[in-house]
UniProtKB/Swiss-Prot annotation:
Protein name according to UniProt: 3-ketoacyl-CoA thiolase, mitochondrial
Record lineage: Eukaryota, Metazoa, Chordata, Craniata, Vertebrata
GO terms of molecular function: acetyl-CoA C-acetyltransferase activity; acetyl-CoA C-acyltransferase activity; acetyl-CoA hydrolase activity; fatty acyl-CoA hydrolase activity
Organism field: Mus musculus
Residues that coordinate or bind CoA: 224, 227, 251
Site (Increases nucleophilicity of active site Cys): 352
Length: 397
């Protein structure tokens, strides 16, 4: 048993993911989390007053009120004023980390019911001018910094995230054609899952304003299901000459949020919640930052070891698709079964709003595991700076 107490997921919802500068661009990360949290509270029949803690992961802090994010989410959805809130940042693992931190609070009996979430509005990432607060020298050429682009570069190793994926492509002999074929598969699997309604249980529709008036958004906006291999092959590589990473086989810059409500076994019984899944275990691992994308390998292995399970026990595996060569390197290193890995597509198709992806992956695994009648699933993400995080869940149906 990897956890000291039984911890159960009693609700798991996410917003549709918006394209960069798309339908969700005017919603802050706080707004997006509020939508997901309200949907989760409603779906799980969880009264807000039963929430003991609010934990939300967010990376870019792109809105002016971002410092208050988790607190504002809690207050907006009716969580008692006396209940504390925490906004955390483990980069692309932040959505997963919110659940991990929630489990830790429950296991230490600091909380019984925790509203967890992950969120990002990449569209709202501002441009900034640094070092002007105390005046500038005559003639100084002020530089306008794109905080989004700057945030996707690891200054410690002086590499943009895309180059760490190129390093993995070289290390694991991943070709450009491999990457484009995988990107096409991600789009096609997303299309099939979307048309079959496999995202319906996790989705929290949002009313958005368009040129044609208000409409309900309930489908991921970034996905390009009509993409062909020929189109992908024509795209130029972005980070190095004759490289593998293109705009078509990398995760999409996007906006979105997810909310996962977890509760102790005692709380499930006390409040008569319906458990959807049990949190079996988790693991966080560091790795070489120049190949940060390999992080899911030690993370998944660590989580499985703690839980006394193996990859063969997993009915579903979901590894965040930061870049196609990154995912393919993880797949090769772990010898993942393609038939049960990223079965509904991933971030290459639907986008990767940094803090939101862990919550999205968890929500999808919860509902997809139940739909398929499977037992175990593991979700994982690589993390900029050289980390990996993994979370194992068990179907309770």
């Amino acid at each position: 048993m990897a956890l000291l107490r039984g911890v159960f997921i009693v609700a798991a919802k996410r917003t549709p993911f918006g394209a960069y500068g798309g339908l969700l661009k005017d919603f802050s990360a706080t707004d997006l989390t509020e939508f997901a949290a309200r949907a989760a509270l409603s779906a799980g029949k969880v009264p807000p007053e039963t929430i003991d803690s609010v934990i939300v992961g967010n990376v870019m802090q792109s809105s002016s009120d971002a410092a208050y994010l988790a607190r504002h989410v809690g207050l907006r959805v009716g969580v008692p004023t006396e209940t504390g809130a925490l906004t955390l940042n483990r980069l692309c693992g932040s959505g997963f980390q919110s659940i991990v931190s929630g489990c830790q609070e429950i296991c230490s009996k600091d909380a019984e019911v925790v509203l967890c979430g992950g969120t990002e509005s990449m569209s709202q990432s501002p441009y900034c001018v640094r070092n002007v607060r105390f005046g500038t020298k005559f003639g100084l050429d002020l530089k306008l910094e794109d905080t989004l682009w700057a945030g996707l570069t690891d200054q410690h190793v002086k590499l943009p995230m895309g180059m760490t994926a190129e390093n993995l492509a070289a290390k694991y002999n991943i070709s450009r054609e491999d990457c484009d074929r995988y990107a096409l598969q991600s789009q096609q699997r997303w299309k099939a899952a979307n048309e079959a309604g496999y995202f319906n249980e996790e989705m929290a529709p949002i009313e958005v304003k368009t040129k044609k008036g208000k409409q309900t958004m309930q489908v991921d906006e970034h996905a390009r299901p009509q993409t062909t291999l020929e189109q992908l092959q024509k795209l130029p590589s972005v980070f190095k000459k004759d490289g593998t990473v293109t705009a078509g086989n990398a995760s999409g810059v996007s906006d979105g949020a997810g909310a996962v409500i977890i509760a102790s076994e005692d709380a499930v019984k006390k409040h008569n919640f319906t458990p959807l899944a049990r949190v079996v275990g988790y693991f966080v691992s560091g790795c070489d930052p120049t190949i940060m994308g390999i992080g899911p390998v030690p993370a998944i292995n660590g989580a499985l070891k703690k839980a006394g399970l193996s990859l063969k026990d997993m009915d579903l595996i979901d590894v965040n698709e930061a870049f196609a060569p990154q995912f393919l390197s993880v797949q090769k290193a772990l010898d993942l079964d393609p038939s049960k890995t990223n079965v509904s597509g991933g971030a290459i198709a639907l986008g990767h709003p940094l803090g939101g992806s862990g919550s999205r992956i968890t929500a999808h695994l919860v509902h997809e595991l139940r739909r398929r009648g499977g037992k175990y699933a593991v979700g994982s993400a690589c993390i900029g700076g050289g980390q990996g995080i993994a979370l194992i869940i068990q179907n309770t149906a």
